[in-house]
């Protein structure tokens, strides 16, 4: 397996200092879990360089509880130095550790040219593109009363429409390589009765933009209760010729490589024979090797990818 979506820090206010020892520990944990390569992909919004350009973007939205919540979230998250982060991950890579330099880049409507300018000149291997926010509403914050009140106030079809519109613009921007947790709009467990039209739009957007799609195990930890993407969407990605990466979206060391066997089975069931790895933002195919590991416990056990 490749675990191509990993964060050094959990959410919330904390000391945001990247260290070589921390990256090395992630690599060691990955190898213990049978993960052959990882990508460190911290959130762009956690860095001061992004805050200098994008901070306050939510003020373009009408005053509301969700706008206030977004301001609080952003201010709690920011503080890391992008130059130091890049330096540390490159040092680990240069030392021969199985890691590539990445970043998770949120979608900012009408501002992706500003995002591209922030990223310009850094030697990233892979950039993940994510939609976590619809306007100032951080819809994936399912532990927040403010967020869930907004879910209650909106028709689920309208949420999925707005999400698909954002995916279209993100893909067409050409800024990112991989569509992270592609159907994150299901995070709260709320889906249209028949989501086919939205799945078709997501698959078409990824194919049109030349993006890979991420198969992300973190959905099993959410009310969605399944991986991102849903099996139907994964099948549509395969039919459209969209490559895939594999990921846990772990923010903690002990979740690196989590449920890799389940992810492998999803890939094989959808017809995939390889996953996408990246170097210098150039994609390469990494064959899927499906074989039980010594810790395989049968159904739901571990499978090598």
Range-by-range predicted roles:
Residues 52-62, 118-124, 142:
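Aromatic- and acidic-residue-enriched segments that line the glycan-binding/catalytic groove
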Residues 103, 130-131, 279:
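Residues at the C-termini of beta-strands that transition into short coil/loop
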Residues 20, 45, 107-110, 122, ...:
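Divalent metal-binding pocket/active-site signature
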Residues 23-27, 82-90, 164-167, 199, ...:
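Generic structural signal for well-ordered alpha-helices
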Residues 1-109, 187-189, 193, 197, ...:
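An N-terminally biased module of ancient metal coordination in phosphate/nucleic-acid-related enzymes
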Residues 1-11, 49, 136, 174, ...:
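Charged catalytic cores and adjacent phosphate/nucleic-acid-binding surfaces used
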Residues 36-37, 125, 177, 273:
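Short acidic/polar active-site loop segments enriched in Thr and Asp
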Residues 1, 31-32, 86-96, 116-125, ...:
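Acidic (Asp/Glu)-rich catalytic clusters
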């Amino acid at each position: 397996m490749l675990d191509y979506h990993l964060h050094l820090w959990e959410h919330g206010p904390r000391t945001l200092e990247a260290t070589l020892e921390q990256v090395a520990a992630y690599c060691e944990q990955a190898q213990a879990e049978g993960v052959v390569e990882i990508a460190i992909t911290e959130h762009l919004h956690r860095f001061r360089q992004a805050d200098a350009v994008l901070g306050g973007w939510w003020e373009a939205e009408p005053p509301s509880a969700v706008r206030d919540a977004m301001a609080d979230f952003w201010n709690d998250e920011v503080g890391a130095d992008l130059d130091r982060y890049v330096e540390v991950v490159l040092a680990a890579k240069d030392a021969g550790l199985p890691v590539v330099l990445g970043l998770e880049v949120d979608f900012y409507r009408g501002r992706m040219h500003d995002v591209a300018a922030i990223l310009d000149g850094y030697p990233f291997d892979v950039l993940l593109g994510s939609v976590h926010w619809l306007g100032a509403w951080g819809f994936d914050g399912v532990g927040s009363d403010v967020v869930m009140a907004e879910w209650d106030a909106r028709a689920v079809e309208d949420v999925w429409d707005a999400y698909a519109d954002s995916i279209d613009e993100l893909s067409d921007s050409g800024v990112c390589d991989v569509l992270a947790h592609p159907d994150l709009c299901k995070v709260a467990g709320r889906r249209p009765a028949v989501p086919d039209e939205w799945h078709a739009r997501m698959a078409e957007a990824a194919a049109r933009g030349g993006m890979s799609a991420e198969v992300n195990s973190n959905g099993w930890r959410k009310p969605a209760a399944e991986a991102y993407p849903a099996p139907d969407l994964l099948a549509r990605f395969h039919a459209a010729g969209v490559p895939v990466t594999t990921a846990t979206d772990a923010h903690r060391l002990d979740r690196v490589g989590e449920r890799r066997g389940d992810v492998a089975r999803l890939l094989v069931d959808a017809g995939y024979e390889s996953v996408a790895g990246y170097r210098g933002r150039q994609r390469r195919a990494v064959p899927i090797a499906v074989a039980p590991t010594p810790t395989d416990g049968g159904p739901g056990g571990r499978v090598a990818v």
